[in-house]
Amino acid sequence: MNNKGSGLTPAQALDKLDALYEQSVVALRNAIGKYITSGELPDENARKQGLFVYPSLTVTWDGSTTNPPKTRAFGRFTHAGSYTTTITRPTLFRSYLNEQLTLLYQDYGAHISVQPSQHEIPYPYVIDGSELTLDRSMSAGLTRYFPTTELAQIGDETADGIYHPTEFSPLSHFDARRVDFSLARLRHYTGTPVEHFQPFVLFTNYTRYVDEFVRWGCSQILDPDSPYIALSCAGGNWITAETEAPEEAISDLAWKKHQMPAWHLITADGQGITLVNIGVGPSNAKTICDHLAVLRPDVWLMIGHCGGLRESQAIGDYVLAHAYLRDDHVLDAVLPPDIPIPSIAEVQRALYDATKLVSGRPGEEVKQRLRTGTVVTTDDRNWELRYSASALRFNLSRAVAIDMESATIAAQGYRFRVPYGTLLCVSDKSLHGEIKLPGQANRFYAVSYTHLTLPTIA
């Protein structure tokens, strides 16, 4: 049985989402404008009728499809029933939504409907991009008379599987309020528009990797045979083939204003690469993944430096993580550390093949420089000061490297259903007397590998 009935096609649903969302945004901006200029308050009756609400998307399947697809990880139902969520920024997510809805529509004959929801758009999310000018004295009034962000309504219960069942099952991991919250944070932390983020994401904890990414990105933009057309940089720089001295333009200090600056190597079809310098520590790693997950990237990879834990390793060797020892503690409440974080075969293979491709060496020679094993992620930057306890734990786990971000990023990928992987470079060997010293960074960088990860996703 096909239950499409009088429902919408994916294209019709997306158009209606666009129209309803834009209608609410315009109404909210107009009401704010009137309040600023004349003190006029929004009409309470109109608000109750949905003047400022998000649109909602509902997909229903009656369970009658014969032999539904079971192997793919997305675009499928687990049981019959109705699934719903609220939607924000439908234009930004159009390609993603179209892919998902098309699979459900074609393979299951799903019934798709769009209507106004009961959840209002918080006013801070419509200010950006408008011509509205606010000062601090207006903040209290706006918060009193207009919908605002209520943290009690924002959470990851759905993604963490602890939501309370209702008549409708959740259609997405994140509803509109959670998405808007993260989109605002992404712009704040990275210094770039959310529209510029690409689906293939690199995280790093080393500034020099940014330098290499920028250098390589600029060369790609100048190559007429390359699919890359622009480089968006933290701080507002926009680099194209017409930009004079692009690397000099990027070298200003604008990116330093942001906690986790990002650079986006953009393609015309939106299949480019984003690099985020997340700095040091599991807190930053958790934070950026919490927010970036709402964009549903195709993959995120950690490329950074680490401490080598084995005598057989040398500075400049590579570490491909196939397991993680989670001593970061930032996710223990939502993903206990005894839950294993498996490596993803396709990602592991791609990283290994990229290492062979760029090095130009056969597999046996690559294995002399590329160590596969367990990576420890700690929240203690001075773990060396607890040598006895640390050394025992490393031996029990057979760990080969230690850092402060990789396991957190992998755990967040597992938690939010984003493919993940880790390729690190050994920068020091504290357990064997080769500690990190001033000036050693130049030596490490000389044998480093940023260019190895780019063919993996380019």
Where are each of the predicted segments found?
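Flexible, glycine/proline-enriched loop segments at strand-loop-helix junctions
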Residues: 199, 274-280, 333-343, 397-400
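Alpha-helix C-terminal capping segments
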Residues: 291-296, 310-314, 411-419
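Conserved small/polar residues in nucleotide/adenosyl-binding loops
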Residues: 450-456
